Structures are given as structure tokens and as C-alpha cells.
Amino acid sequence: MAVTVGVICAIPQELAYLRGVLVDAKRQQVAQILFDSGQLDAHRVVLAAAGMGKVNTGLTATLLADRFGCRTIVFTGVAGGLDPELCIGDIVIADRVVQHDFGLLTDERLRPYQPGHIPFIEPTERLGYPVDPAVIDRVKHRLDGFTLAPLSTAAGGGGRQPRIYYGTILTGDQYLHCERTRNRLHHELGGMAVEMEGGAVAQICASFDIPWLVIRALSDLAGADSGVDFNRFVGEVAASSARVLLRLLPVLTAC
């Protein structure tokens, strides 16, 4: 039986490319969220326009799993880079996500902790949600040798070919526009990129016991220029993230 993949995006720029290549599309609205069912490269998918943030994404992921019967859920879109070795246009595929804004406030600082737990109520040693290693192995094999085009000159591309990385992606309900915080999150939590939705996808999919994946293209570097960079690069890098998703659909429908 063919597996239906749920695909979540937060903003219109992230959905535009995928909606443009979706065939046999049928649209419905549930809880003010637009869902487009159809096929991408002959694979059954449901595209969802979640809106930004963890609550919107959690609601959307729940509907995809429960109402639409999706057996794998993917978030594809853009993110801010945390790792100084990365550049705008690079792709980060999560092998783990951490909600950096959930935890225990003490001495005016937040100690990140696993969602659903605090140190003195249901304590746990876990922090974050790992992607199924078998899924990551299939993803890496499928993307071996896969290349992405450099950003255009119009978008400020300098001819460098974007690279694909695997690592920790951080999630929080803030748009990061601060170099000090960026450096701290990278140093303390090992985050390669930061965004506002992936942690919710992971938490919901863990509850439903279904596979998930987060694919992010860097639209900015989460520092003082992040707003300028975002508007300059978002369209092109979001399309790059979508192309990676299309490449991965054969292995995601096998999950």
C-alpha cells in the first residue's frame, strides 16, 4: 500500500515551488489550515500551510497524521544558520531536533529540558528528539552525489555550490536576530540551524509513532543582518529545500 507523506511548510515562499509541481491537486481547509492533496513525482502527498511557530505546526502535524492518514511527515523550508562554518544556501537535514525555548527558568536563565518534563516532575536524561537512524541512512544514501545549483547573481550568489549537512536543528518560538544568542545556542546545544517549527513535528510524530524529517535551507545567519538576508534569499533557498524533498520522496514513502 502506498504511503502518504505529509509535507508541512510555514510560509508561502516555502510552499510555492511544491504547489507549482503538485498534480491532481485537491484542496480543503481544516481549522483555518489549507491542505493540498495530490502527487509529487507519482508519490502521494498532502501539502500543508501551517503558519509559523510550534502551536500551528503541532496542530497541522496532528491533522496530517490523524485525519489525512499520513505515515511520514516532513517539514521543508528555511532556517537561520548557527554554525559559523555554514553559508546561506546550505542545506541542514536534522538528525536531532531540540526545543531550545522549553525548560526551567533559574537565576534569570533558561535551562533547556525535554518537553513534557521538568527536573522534579517526570525527570529525564533525554534532550531532543532523534531521527530514526534507518531513515537518516536512507536519506544519506539517496542524496549521495546530489548537487544543488549556486544561488543566482541576482540573489547575491557568488558561485559557491550549496552543501548538505546533517546535525542538530534547534526550534523555538522566536525569530533569532541576535549574534550573541546565535553563538550561545551553537556552543551550548550544538545547533547547526535554528527555526520555529521542527521540534513540534518531532514531538507530534513521536506521539503517533511515525517517522519524520526536517529539511532546512539557510536563508540567513541569525545575526544582526538576518532580516535583510532573509528577504533577499528566502525564495531561492526555499526552492532548494523543496528540491531536496523531491529527491527524497522515494525513500520517505518506504518508511
Curated annotation (Swiss-Prot):
Question: CDD domains recorded for this chain?
Answer: MTAN
What does the record give as the active site?
14 (proton acceptor), 220 (proton donor)
Going by the entry's taxonomy, the superkingdom of the source organism is recorded as Bacteria
Q: What class of enzyme is it?
A: hydrolase
SUPFAM superfamilies under this entry? Purine and uridine phosphorylases
Q: According to the UniProt entry, what is the EC number of this protein?
A: 3.2.2.9
Gene Ontology CC terms: cytosol
> Which keywords does UniProt give here?
Amino-acid biosynthesis, Hydrolase, Methionine biosynthesis
BP terms from Gene Ontology: L-methionine salvage from methylthioadenosine; L-methionine salvage from S-adenosylmethionine; nucleoside metabolic process
What reaction does this catalyse?
S-adenosyl-L-homocysteine + H2O = S-(5-deoxy-D-ribos-5-yl)-L-homocysteine + adenine; S-methyl-5'-thioadenosine + H2O = 5-(methylsulfanyl)-D-ribose + adenine; 5'-deoxyadenosine + H2O = 5-deoxy-D-ribose + adenine
Q: List the disulfide bonds.
A: none
| Keyword Amino-acid biosynthesis annotated | yes
Task: Name the pathway it acts in.
Answer: Amino-acid biosynthesis; L-methionine biosynthesis via salvage pathway; S-methyl-5-thio-alpha-D-ribose 1-phosphate from S-methyl-5'-thioadenosine (hydrolase route): step 1/2
User: Where substrate is bound, by residue?
Assistant: 80, 176, 196-197
Query: Any other noteworthy remark?
Result: Was identified as a high-confidence drug target.
**Job of this protein:** Catalyzes the irreversible cleavage of the glycosidic bond in both 5'-methylthioadenosine (MTA) and S-adenosylhomocysteine (SAH/AdoHcy) to adenine and the corresponding thioribose, 5'-methylthioribose and S-ribosylhomocysteine, respectively. Also cleaves 5'-deoxyadenosine, a toxic by-product of radical S-adenosylmethionine (SAM) enzymes, into 5-deoxyribose and adenine.
Q: What is this protein called?
A: 5'-methylthioadenosine/S-adenosylhomocysteine nucleosidase
Source organism of the structure: Mycobacterium tuberculosis (strain ATCC 25618 / H37Rv)
